[in-house]
Amino acid sequence: MAKYNNNNYANKATNLKQQVVLPTYTLDSNLVLLPGIMYNVTFSRFKAAALLYRYKNFISQVSIINNLLSEYDFNSGNSNEEERSETEQKIEQSSLGQPETYHEINPSVISTEAVEGIKEFFQYETNMKTGRGGKGEKEAKSTNDGIKEFDWLTLAIIPNLDKIKDPETNYSIGDAAKLTNVVTVARIIGIVDDSTNIKLTLQAITRGVQITDDSKMNQHKNGLKTNEQVIGIDWNHNVSDLKGKFNALQKNYQQLFQSIDKFLIDYREALDYNKNNSNNKNGNLSLIKGNATINNNKNSDDKSNQDIKSQNLLTLNPLANALYMQLVGSKDFNKAFHRLEKLFSQVSKNDEYKIDNETYLRLVDLTCGILPFPNFQKLALLNKYKLDDRSVLINEMILQLIQIFENLQTNNSFVNNWFHSEATNIQKANVVANQLKSIRNLLEGMTKNRPIKSNKRNPGPASSSGPSFSNGKSSPGRANARPKSNHQDGFNGNDGDYNDVDDDDDGDEDLKAIFNFIKHKLPTISTLSADSKRLILKDFKRVKASANSPGGGGNSDFHVLRNYLEIVMDIPWDNYVTKFKSNKDIDLKLAKKQLDDDHYGLEHVKKRLIQYLVVLKLLGINAEKDQSDKSQPIKDNSKDSPNSSSKALTKSPTSSLSRKTISSIVIANKDETYLAKQQAKTTNQKSITEAKTNPSTTMITSNESIHVSKNNKSPIIMLAGPPGTGKTSLAKSIASALGRNFQRISLGGIKDESEIRGHRRTYVGAMPGLLIQALRKSRCMNPVILLDEIDKVIGGNNSGGVNKFNGDPSAALLEVLDPEQNNTFIDHYLGFPIDLSQVIFICTANDPWNMTRPLLDRLETIEIGAYDYNEKLIIGKKYLLPRQIKRNGFPVVDTKKMTTVVAGSSNQDEFIRINDATMKKVILDYTRGEAGVRNFERRLGTLCRFKAVEYCEWLNKDIKNYNPIIDENDLPIYLGVPYSSGDVTTEGTVGVGVVHGLSYNSDGSGSVLVFESIGFDRRISNKEHNGGNGATLNMTGRLGEVLMESGKIGLVFIKSMIYKNILKFDNNNNNKHLLLDKYNNLDIHMHVPMGSVSKDGPSAGVTMALSFLSVLLDKPVPSDIAMTGEITLRGIILPIGGVKEKLMGAHLNSNIKRMIVPRENRKDLIKEYSRSIEEAGEVLDHHLINDLIKDNEDKEFKLTQVEEYYQNKYGISLFYAKEFYDIIKIVWNEDEVLLKQDNSRLLEYHI
């Protein structure tokens, strides 16, 4: 026998009662929560967010809750009411326990009294578990360290009496006087997000009583909110005569279990016989016990009696069917029932098992919660606040259920005996006919009357998540990977006959979700044409016709069409997400601040995005004015329509449930979205009638909300620049500033058109393209989609001989990135147009010239150049170093989460401090030649890791002091030997034929290249040689074809200058013949150092021409001059690209003091000058820019602010040349190289 531990709580009675303030919540379903059991309850996303928002100050670390709360804006007062439908407003009112006249729709955080009440409740609960008994309030308030995030989610669940009916009167219990004010104190311990609904796991802890007339109620009267109550809780579990009550409960339960076991055996035997009999050769139901001839043999009589026993009519009894479905309809329920029986048997057989008061009371509640008792009896047991009354009631309920099984067995025996022994064949046939007729009438009533009586039905379980045993712990399950449909009001009668689609309750959940989408959601989609909806409806009817047959009834397209409809259903139709409530409420300052906080500089990119937001704001203001001019009925209806750019349009979801079983006592899932679904169906039926009478006004409200955004085409931007300049992170920042969802699509290496447009459904395993998949992942139709590395798509200019069997993906992007076409983008898998006009496409590219011309023409290109070391210094101090300090584990205070931020409040200087000189040395010596900041951030990360090691050693007291300062002398210790200087090839004295050129590297940086030329006179080696065949040119250094052509052009131009007798040579009058003879006998070898690096491009034409001229005239070129520019056969200097990068490359070389650039590139320098002023935060004088542009049109400009700016910033003097004669004068300005002064058409331009 079991032992009994009757604890004596008499000395602690005063400490076992408490009165605390707790948040309250009223369920929409008829679910009754009994203590000791965990329940899975499905909520709509809005209702779950409204409930969890009340605890937002205590659950900030739970990511799934933060993601849910971010979908709704509860902080904007009552203005949020416009975002929600009337259905959801009524749902919120009912859940708060308020009448429909209650206007404070937005939820509010729990009050201070409720916070203290949760603390006190948690402390009492903890003490009861540890056996310490209750504590006083003061002591309870002082011990809050053990409260975790989910422990705060404590509330009092009020049963919905209006949903629980009394079987005697058939009226809801709420219509009569309420029995008591008993509530269930529960805690949310699990959250599952299936992308459509939210499933909360509620752990019922104990009973409580609402205190209405009490001193504590009056004490908190002013501080309490409407959804909070003072709850009285009695932790006293002392049961009188524990042994006698447990023996009575155990005896009654064993008797009940035997009755249930016998019933299940009889039912299964009858069920198995009928199943086997249906497979006989005749295939007909036998209404007589044998053939017409009766065999008097005893064996025949025994067989006949056995057939009578087997042909049990139990399966035709409605009560038997109802009990059987409750007992074995769910695997989880069946599992919990048998484990409960095992627990009773274990207690009775184990002598060492102690039965205390808490275990007994828990068994009482478990017995009531698991056994098939109706909800009104469960409510009655919940209301039994006194322990003795509870014990009496549970025994009465068990005895009543035993009597039901006994009566069922007696009645079934009577019917079987009459049917098989006394009834004639005609009577048997009439019985079966009446049964079939009753079933038919019931089915017809369920089909016809459901829309009318839908709001009066009691909600059943959405699906069985079943009861199982509890170990006192539970963890949130995983979300269902298959999202369900969304119900929205409204109907377009011209899109198809949706009323012909019948609901099939016998189908699986996935087909029900598809049906709900076709029935309720599809007619309301404004971005789909009538033809597209007709095609979808046609495919659905094909699936519906094969759904009731196993495996699709032999239809090979069944699973293909079903997957297709599930994907169509999963697309977020008409769902537009943004940070701002409406377009007219866009906060431009907030968006600009977001961009500035994430990235330094890049003002030209930020300016373009702010312009886009300004256009949206103006369109929103204009739309509001246009809306006010419309008729009053339309104006009133438009107030209830959600705006397309509002925060995550509210949904009216269907029920769904994860099939994952939680290892605990869990009651079958109750669907809290039932009220929303029923009201949505009623509203939908009403809208159908209105659509038939006046179809033109049906969709005005929803179309009006989307019309604001559709007037403005979303920009299609391409960020072009070298790697590491922040293109991808800038796209994320754009999405954050706009409050839109972000999706990234990597296009690098894509060579199949189907990756963009999707595969056709005829292929096995076909799926939509990357764009449709991005819409599904973002859950909205207006995300920010980043098309990363668009210049590396295999196709167009990148085809390189690749066969076009798989199509050209770069050509497929032409439709996507064209604002005039992407509103009707057709994916091969879907087969109908999709509106992508609200998607902001941001492309990134390193080499835009690799793209095809039509594709490049569709993009608004924004150049992002390389950073100079001053910009890198600011970026490193403001962004990179704080990020690396935090990533490497230093306990840095996050100022963004502080309510009040004081200047200098960040404590990162306590861990690592790097001055500007050290930071600059890292940039110049350890990340030389980098256009972006990736290597720079890696170096900073290395420094932080070394310091992290020292910090840990200091914490472990291995070293005495920790020095956070890093100076220049520490860099070789942490980073090693710096890179070799790039000035090696440029060092040395002035030499003949040695000229410094400038290059733009593939990584986006600039550098100085040295062109070395040496000339050999063939006449010296061969004195008998009388004439020359012309100069020969040999070029080495891994040079490209374009660069070698530029060298040949420069050499020919030098020859033309000799023929024109322009150059001087040895102050001799016979200059032309002497120079020509030397030229014809000259062998020139030109080499460009760093031979492993390929070099190409026309910008070194002037450099090579000057090198050849230096060799011919034997005149050295100053080593402090670098030049760039393309040369023609006429000696004209053409503009080149990458002037800013080449200027920074010259600046990094300490030998370069002067720089020659083409005259036409001065406009690029003016542009960079104005951009640099803006990014530095200074006010740009627009009048000065206009004056500079006008002055630049003159041959001899007078305004030198641009040149002075670069002189001060980089220490380099700028010179401009339009013809090669200008370069000769700039280089050899003190010598008279030119024979005729009037041949110089232009003067040099310098400071």
From Swiss-Prot:
Q: Which UniProt keywords apply?
A: ATP-binding, Hydrolase, Nucleotide-binding, Peroxisome, Protease, Serine protease
Give its E.C. classification number.
3.4.21.53
- Catalysis: reaction(s): Hydrolysis of proteins in presence of ATP
SMART domains in alphabetical order: AAA
Q: Look at the named UniProt entry and state the broad enzyme category this protein falls under.
A: hydrolase
Q: Where is the composition biased (Low complexity)?
A: 459-477
Q: Which residues are ATP-binding? A: 721-728
GO biological process: one example: protein processing
Task: Supply the name of the protein.
Answer: Lon protease homolog 2, peroxisomal
Q: What main location does UniProt list?
A: other
The UniProt regions of compositional bias labelled Basic and acidic residues, in chain numbering, are: 626-639
**Recorded GO MF terms:** ATP binding; ATP hydrolysis activity; ATP-dependent peptidase activity; serine-type endopeptidase activity
UniProt xrefs under PROSITE patterns: LON_N, LON_PROTEOLYTIC, LON_SER
Organism in which the protein naturally occurs: Candida dubliniensis (strain CD36 / ATCC MYA-646 / CBS 7987 / NCPF 3949 / NRRL Y-17841) (Yeast)
**Ranges where the record places region Disordered:** 76-103, 447-503, 626-655
Q: Where is the Lon proteolytic domain positioned along the sequence? A: 989-1230
Limits of the Lon N-terminal domain: 22-402
Q: Which domain of life is it from?
A: Eukaryota
Task: Kindly list the GO CC terms recorded for this protein.
Answer: peroxisomal matrix
Report the function annotation for this chain.
Answer: ATP-dependent serine protease that mediates the selective degradation of misfolded and unassembled polypeptides in the peroxisomal matrix. Necessary for type 2 peroxisome targeting signal (PTS2)-containing protein processing and facilitates peroxisome matrix protein import.
